[in-house]
């Protein structure tokens, strides 16, 4: 089957690779000159199969009010007269109940665990190296209240059979020895030992090369204008260069997916939530992390990537803007230097990307009302984590096969 994949980020490239392996004739279209040059370029680097939770959670509305007045706030809201923003925020708030949180977290963990298996298989199959480490994620608590509040996450992990360990201060230091220098600043943590780390940009570029070897064509520097639909079936894609025909199209355009789908009457509740990162060369390894540490107070991930530290986080709701706010850089610098001052901040590179967030935290994967048109988008902060499992699902669904896990509640139909 002739398939076009729209988007050459981690989700699009893994989808293309999986489809090519299944024997399809695949073309990837992206406006950038190469793969992984937008949201996949410098994300936090965590592959969080266990540390995987919806942002919409009980207590978040009250926390959000407090965050708005913090100097180093994990949430930044720049409200505007944007109906898409207002609708998305209202839907997210409706998911901030214990019942919805449990449902959403369970399906996120299901897809994440499936992705863990898929990534291990892909790594063994291709031999790709991407500064990977398989040492787990430590959710680090600075207060007793944070430690006690983690009980709901522990309950969800236990219910889904995901390994975890609740650590006291000394346990955190055993996992991350550099924390011994700041032991008075922490009270404990939640360790998910099956989590991994790795450079998403390196991985995506290496996999794109493997996909090309399988016959996948990459149309870089190509702007997507519209989907070509006739009589309720997708016929291809219209770009600034040509009309490209296909029997199936997979939309993996992240935050830009809703803009392409809207003219077809497909209302996809995905909205951009900007995140920021610093990439810092290590100057003193004894004060650098070994794996990924999530600073719960500031919702910032601090990750070891080879001889670098990647610091990523924050949620800025400001629409389709990619400017670099210096106040956001200050927050990242504060968190990492407070816990792991082993990097040379003077040589750090600063970046931002638009995460495609759904109001319930779960990506949208599956068919649409237009025959032959499939979605693989809305992964939020977990595109790297969920990419390989999502790609397997798309490979099965496009080919008319039966997915290995239940994917029905990942489809757009869950929004009514």
From Swiss-Prot:
GO terms for biological process: D-alanine catabolic process. It is an enzyme of class 1 (oxidoreductase). Pathway: Amino-acid degradation; D-alanine degradation; NH(3) and pyruvate from D-alanine: step 1/1. GO terms for molecular function: D-amino-acid dehydrogenase activity. It catalyses: a D-alpha-amino acid + A + H2O = a 2-oxocarboxylate + AH2 + NH4(+). This is D-amino acid dehydrogenase. Signal peptide: none annotated. Belongs to the DadA oxidoreductase family. Keywords: FAD, Flavoprotein, Oxidoreductase, Plasmid. Oxidative deamination of D-amino acids. It comes from Rhizobium johnstonii (strain DSM 114642 / LMG 32736 / 3841). The keyword Protein biosynthesis does not apply.
């Amino acid at each position: 089957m002739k398939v076009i994949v729209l988007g050459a980020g981690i989700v699009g490239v893994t989808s293309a690779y999986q489809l090519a392996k299944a024997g399809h004739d695949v073309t990837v279209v992206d406006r950038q000159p190469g793969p992984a040059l937008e949201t996949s370029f410098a994300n936090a680097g965590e592959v969080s199969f266990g540390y995987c939770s919806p942002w919409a959670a009980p207590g978040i509305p009250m926390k959000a009010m407090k965050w708005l007045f913090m100097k180093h706030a994990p949430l930044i809201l720049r409200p505007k007269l944007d109906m898409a923003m207002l609708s998305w925020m209202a839907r997210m708030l409706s998911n901030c109940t214990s019942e919805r949180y449990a449902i959403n977290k369970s399906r996120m963990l299901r897809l994440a665990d499936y992705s863990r298996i898929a990534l291990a298989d892909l790594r063994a199959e291709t031999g790709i190296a991407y500064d990977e480490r398989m040492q787990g994620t430590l959710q680090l608590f600075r207060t007793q209240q944070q430690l006690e509040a983690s009980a709901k996450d522990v309950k969800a992990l236990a219910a889904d059979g995901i390994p975890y360990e609740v650590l006291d201060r000394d346990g955190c230091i055993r996992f991350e020895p550099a924390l011994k220098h700041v032991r008075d600043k922490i009270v404990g943590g939640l360790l998910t030992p099956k989590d991994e780390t790795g450079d998403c940009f390196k991985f995506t570029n290496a996999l794109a090369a493997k996909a090309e070897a399988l016959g996948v064509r990459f149309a870089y520097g190509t702007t997507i204008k519209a989907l070509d639909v006739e009589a309720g079936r997708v016929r291809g894609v219209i770009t600034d260069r040509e009309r490209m025909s296909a029997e199936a199209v997979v939309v993996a355009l992240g935050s830009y997916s809703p803009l392409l789908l809207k003219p077809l009457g497909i209302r996809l509740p995905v909205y951009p939530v900007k995140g920021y990162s610093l990439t810092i060369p290590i100057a003193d390894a004894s004060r650098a992390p070994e794996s990924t540490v999530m600073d719960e107070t500031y919702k910032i991930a601090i990750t070891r990537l080879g001889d670098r530290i990647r610091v990523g986080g924050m949620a800025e709701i400001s629409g389709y803007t990619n400017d670099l706010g210096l106040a956001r850089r200050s927050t990242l610098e504060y968190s990492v230097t407070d816990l792991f001052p082993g990097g040379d901040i003077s040589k750090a590179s600063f970046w931002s990307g638009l995460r495609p967030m759904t109001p319930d935290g779960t990506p949208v994967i599956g068919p649409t009302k237009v025959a032959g048109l499939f979605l693989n988008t809305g992964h939020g902060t977990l595109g790297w984590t969920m990419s390989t499992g999502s790609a397997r699902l798309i490979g099965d669904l496009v080919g008319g096969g039966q997915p290995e896990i239940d994917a029905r509640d990942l489809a757009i139909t869950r929004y009514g």
